Amino acid sequence: MRAGRALSNIAEQYRFHASIGGARLQRWLYLSIYYASWLVLRWGDRHTRALAVLRCLGMSDRRALLNLPDGLLLELDLYTSYDALYPIYEGRIYAPEPGFEPKSGWVVFDLGAQQGIFTCKAAKAVGTQGRVVAFEPHPSNFRLLKENVDRNELRNVTTVEAAVADRIGEADLYLHLHSTGYSLARKSTLGVVRVSLTTLDKTAEELGLQRVDLIKLDIEGSAIPALRGGERLLRRLKPKLAMEFESDRERRELPDWLRGLGYNVRVTAGYLYAD
């Protein structure tokens, strides 16, 4: 059963990447090496070990310009094109719950925008009457985010080079093996970058926003301080929330805290949806 599911997932990845134009050979080679490594390395965290093989081969950070079925043109590193593109575009994360898919006229906050996949997809969905505010603290990711927004002429996107927290200032951003999985919360030995911090409340005030319809969070274990730094916004505007749990603390604390703010919270397959 498990082997059948794994083979089905592999086939779906190849099918999806076959539907995308640009650097197809590079992407298929990346996928093939990843899955071959995953099958051979049968001890420890096989996912992380397979990624380590690709990093040692110098493939994870190679960039590819991709032509997506909806007309977006995105430049992504190969790791991001494998790890994030498929689940976001196939609706596997952030929008599988009814009512959480960005709609025309919505204002969307993208926390942990990385290289802009969700940001650009949401910007097309909300249209010229809507707006997307994208937060990304890591300098190289932010440059790609900006380039992708500009390349697609998405004038309804505001980019913010900062991590979202419960205070204004600076903090160390720790680098991890997962090419774009940088974290304020989880220390590592791979490196550190000093980044700016902002809050949801400050951003909403500075932009003069009277509505925020959806907040998507992918910030590697930092959701608690990020949401606490936006408590006024959450109480006043009640945006929908979609996030993946990244720590046991988030699983323990966030559902009850959000219910205390009047949210209806649903937890499914490691994801939290609140409205």
Describe the residue ranges of each PLM region.
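S-adenosyl-L-methionine
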Residues: 1-138, 143-144, 207, 271-275
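Glycine-rich adenosyl-binding loop in Rossmann-like folds that engage adenosine-containing cofactors
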Residues: 72-100, 155, 160-209
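Conserved acidic-Pro-Pro-aromatic motif
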Residues: 106-107, 202-275
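Hydrophobic pocket-lining residues within nucleotide cofactor-binding pockets
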Residues: 113, 164-166, 200, 219, ...
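Hydrophobic packing residues within well-ordered alpha-helices of enzyme cores
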Residues: 122, 145, 173, 226-230, ...
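Residues in the short beta-alpha loop(s) of Rossmann-like NAD(P)-binding domains
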Residues: 138, 148, 165, 247
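Short alpha-helix adjacent to the SAM-binding motif of class I
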Residues: 140-151, 253
